[in-house]
Each structure stands twice: as structure tokens, then as C-alpha cells.
């Protein structure tokens, strides 16, 4: 998949650094993709651009960079563009169409009306839910059998 715009959302803002490190290790060095985030956990980190800096890089270098963006679920739910009572922030996320939204740690905090509202406001083609412990979602039948991929430590041996 040659996704142009990817958004990673998690209920744990503290794992932002892990996503950034994996991006650097596996993607940044081989693809014309930039990492974009305005979350406090990533402010000032090398290689992390604000959305405005991303747009300027595309214009100034006359290059169509692809984007991997990171935002916390709390950040989305605090935005007027994704919540009924939010403040004016993250308009750039509301304005974009994402080829893929990755919901990391999807067993946490995504089964709420506010989250449903936020995700419903987002323009996205595909959603990937990641979880190491999706017990509730599987028990409820949230996903069809062909939508579930299992991998265990035993599979790595």
C-alpha cells in the first residue's frame, strides 16, 4: 500500500516515542515520508514536524512527501473538530483524508461514545486496530474472522 497520509492514534500518549523510534528505524531512511505530530510528548524531538512545517517542506522542496502523523485519542477528543465540546485545535487532521488510520492499544479507551464520535468525524479509507490483548472485542464479535490476525510468541520460534 502506498498510503499518502497515515494517522496513528493511541489512548496512551506515552508510546509516541516508540512509534517515532520505529518510524526512524524501519521507514524514514528508505522512503520520502515525514513524521508529523503536535503532541506534547514529541515536541522538540528531532525529525518530528508540526503540520505547518510539513506543508512548508513539501512546498519549499517541491516534493510530495507522504505523511505519518501521530495524535493521542485524548487530543482528538479535546478538539472541536472531533468532539462536541472541544477547543479549536487539530483542524489540519479534520481537513485531511487519511488512507489509513492505525488505532494502537485499541483495547483501551476506544469503546466510548466520544471515541465513536471522533472517529466518525474523521475522513479515512481504512482503519487498522492493533492490540496485544483484544479479549473484549473478540468476545463481543466486533470483528469478523477474516478481519483478525493472530501472532504469538510461539509463532516466532
Model region roles, listed by residue range:
Residues 16-19, 43-45, 78-80, 136-141:
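Switch/connector loops and helix/strand junctions flanking conserved nucleotide-binding motifs
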Residues 7-9, 68-72, 100-102:
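Structural motif
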Residues 73-80, 87-129, 133-136:
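SF2 helicase catalytic motif II
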Residues 2-28, 32-34, 38-40, 73-75:
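Conserved Walker A/P-loop ATP-binding site and its immediately adjacent core
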Residues 144-157:
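Interdomain hinge/linker at the junction between the two RecA-like core domains of SF2 helicases
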Residues 22-26, 84-87, 116-117, 141-147:
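Short secondary-structure boundary/capping segments
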Amino acid at each position: 500500500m502506498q498510503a499518502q497520509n497515515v494517522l496513528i492514534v493511541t489512548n496512551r500518549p506515552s508510546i509516541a516515542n516508540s512509534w517515532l523510534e520505529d518510524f526512524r528505524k524501519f521507514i524514514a531512511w528508505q522512503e520520502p515520508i515525514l513524521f508529523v505530530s503536535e503532541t506534547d510528548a514529541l515536541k522538540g524531538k528531532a525529525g518530528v514536524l508540526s503540520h505547518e512545517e510539513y506543508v512548508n517542506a513539501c512546498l519549499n522542496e517541491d516534493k510530495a512527501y507522504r505523511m505519518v502523523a501521530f495524535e493521542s485519542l485524548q487530543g482528538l477528543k479535546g478538539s472541536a473538530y472531533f468532539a462536541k465540546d472541544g477547543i479549536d485545535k487539530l483542524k489540519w487532521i479534520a481537513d485531511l483524508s487519511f488512507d489509513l488510520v492505525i488505532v494502537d492499544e485499541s483495547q483501551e479507551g476506544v469503546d466510548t461514545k466520544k471515541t465513536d464520535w471522533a472517529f466518525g468525524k474523521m475522513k479515512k479509507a481504512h482503519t487498522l486496530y492493533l492490540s496485544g490483548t483484544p479479549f473484549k472485542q473478540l468476545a463481543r464479535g466486533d470483528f469478523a474472522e477474516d478481519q483478525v490476525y493472530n501472532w504469538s510468541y510461539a509463532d516466532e520460534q
